[in-house]
Amino acid sequence: MTQDEMKKAAGWAALKYVEKDSIVGVGTGSTVNHFIDALATMKADIEGAVSSSEASTQKMKALGIPVYDLNSVDRLSVYVDGADEINDHMDMIKGGGAALTREKIVAAVAEKFICIVDNTKQVDILGEFPLPVEVIPMARSYVARQLVKLGGDPVYREGVVTDNGNVILDVYNLKILNPKELESQINEIVGVVTNGLFAKRGADVLLVGTPDGVKTFTAK
């Protein structure tokens, strides 16, 4: 089974968590694209979706899935999204696709976070994948200096502007032993919008595409 086939299996497996007549939170990325394809097969049974990125919004609209503004929605039963890394405690690094702030907002609203990945994304310790930090443009250099003090090597992701009009610093060489603490420390830096650690709001269910099929893990 190829990596993409494992992603597809995880994406389709998430369908069983979608409630009839509900509005579904939808994330961003290659694995989520498979979930969107799956969601389109039951679009008549759901009210619609809330999206964490312009890319996902466009794909869903093209498939005929109604997309709502989050401000007009009172309840999201589930949020389905991928991760760049996830550990055994359901802490994640996300934001490789630069949609981390909107992803974090939608995740905060949802009652249940379903994370869909292939088995290459499971790790013991977070940090091999660079940690994305969304930054107000004028604060970029200041924030980078503060991130160095925390032990990281920040690199400006050139040519990338987020859907919110901000820039991304990718922080390398962090061995993240306490994800919740680091998430708070980085978010307290003036000029940071948010960072790609999803530890305070981790996943509730993890669906992992493997060569032997989809494995399900539940937060303890």
Curated annotation (Swiss-Prot):
GO terms for cellular component: cytosol. Gene3D superfamilies: 3.30.70.260, 3.40.50.1360. InterPro entries: NagB/RpiA_transferase-like, Ribose5P_isomerase_typA_subgr, Ribose5P_isomerase_type_A. Pathway: Carbohydrate degradation; pentose phosphate pathway; D-ribose 5-phosphate from D-ribulose 5-phosphate (non-oxidative stage): step 1/1. It comes from the Bacteria. Its EC number is 5.3.1.6. One of its GO terms (molecular function) is ribose-5-phosphate isomerase activity. It is an enzyme of class 5 (isomerase). It catalyses: aldehydo-D-ribose 5-phosphate = D-ribulose 5-phosphate. The keyword Isomerase applies. Substrate binds at residues 28-31, 81-84, 94-97, 121. The active site is at residue 103. Keywords: Isomerase. Pfam families: Rib_5-P_isom_A. GO terms for biological process: D-ribose metabolic process; pentose-phosphate shunt, non-oxidative branch. Belongs to the ribose 5-phosphate isomerase family. Homodimer. HAMAP family: Rib_5P_isom_A. Catalyzes the reversible conversion of ribose-5-phosphate to ribulose 5-phosphate. This is Ribose-5-phosphate isomerase A. It comes from Shewanella baltica (strain OS185).
